[in-house]
Amino acid sequence: MLYLLIGGFDMSRIGKLPISIPAGVSISQKDNVVTVKGPKGELSQYVHPSIKVNIENSLVTFEIDANHIENSKQKQAYHGLYRSLVNNMVVGVSEGYTKTLELVGVGYRVSNQGNLVEFTLGYTHPIFLQLPKEVKVETKSERNQNPVITIETADKQLLGLICAKIRSFRKPEPYKGKGILFKGEVVRRKSGKSAAAK
């Protein structure tokens, strides 16, 4: 997976912040791979050799290894990047991440059988999406309310990818406000061509 390396100073400042290990969570590392286990699951993340990960006294700290010859700004970016990724894993396995999506449109429906999700979105055929086993999914359709789908997982990156995939089935459109939206999301509306011509 590709990551955007951003602003050395800010990312390095983030990298200096220690991570507290919550009760019920364990962290280990082997061969540049950090593994985090907790009540919500287990996640692993490769860490670039230029970053040293120290686990001690219920704290995880990150430091730049000066023995590795790297571009200075890239090192600083790595410093903050991997600290953020490991912190996301700690939060994920201890608390989990949840997103709720709302289907806005006449006749739109969503249902699931286990992790197989079926969407009816105004096309001539339904859309099926098989979610990974480490993901929990719940769908709800109530009278006079838009159908919703709620997704929970320990993996923040995976959650983002799944939500992006689902939204791509019916991207929010700015004229009628229809589409698949995050719960509470407000679509910035535009005037149609006929209205703009008046």
Q: Which residues does each PLM region occupy?
A:
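Short, Lys/Arg-enriched N-terminal segments with co-localized hydrophobic residues
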Residues: 1-10
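N-terminal intrinsically disordered, cationic/polar leader segments
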Residues: 9-91, 95-164, 168, 173-198
